[in-house]
């Protein structure tokens, strides 16, 4: 959500930003917001004037009542003024109701206006216009065929999607044996990796209130992702970023405690409605998965430096497991409405001979802070909005696809990189059972 002051002072900037995001249908929202804001400010001003006048009249009544002890004729004037006060009270009640209604309407409109993107963001309508920035590691071209990832897992008796389908439907899985252990090893390694980077490890709530959902994401994203608990003001999180940023809702953060750097583990639950949907055969796009996440709450002037650090952490993590990756800059049309700048880290798939997304790093500026009413108290006592950022550390089982394909050997075994061996009981290799 953008600053109303910015919209008042530079509506053309907001309109141009909407065009850059190829959301021309939202252009009328600018005028609608300005009209609602003007009407609300007018109601506030009139109400303030009435309160001032009412206070003056009340004071006058007190003075006249004192005078009426000696001059009873003053009581007639008192009654006349009381009638004015009553009339003004009725009008004030109307104005206060208007203020409430106008503020609510304005808030809903402002939630729909996208955040101002960074000038460095490439302009394009959708993810087809995303720009490759840099590659890390040489893409592998094996001299033997790479099976589909579920076939690799099945060779270790490591997955049962048929049973999961009977129990829960499409988009669920059972991981077992060495594959389940590998899944947990990756999460444990990612946790320790981020702790070594100075982040505080946290296990957050896996369900959040509706006002937190509204604070961290757009309505369209919520509809496509979130599961609501029937009869409760609770939603299952789609990523622990939601509850981690939500931790600061309605809070005043002392500036000296910034940056807040947290890394969190959680299960994640997603409807996956939209263009992609659920993958029928595999575990790339599913309803339930586990993830290690990182978030940063920082001073506005530090957010771009943190953005650079955070996506590079992802690269370092994947390269430590011998997985080639690349950074892909997200174009304007591919950015969610709250994002200022974002990039994907994509892992190399030897089977498909192409990259696929495994991490997403985003700078959201002060959008989430404004929605959640997060504030920082500076050294001078003044309040300001912090910036928030988030990035995937690792999200198995999707990450396992990249891991298994890049570490698969011609005999069907999978090598375990040195960094994961302590988490796998010292194993250096997984041997297929089939």
Question: Residue spans of the language-model regions?
Answer:
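TRNA-recognition modules of translation machinery and tRNA-sensing kinases, especially anticodon-binding
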Residues: 27, 135-434
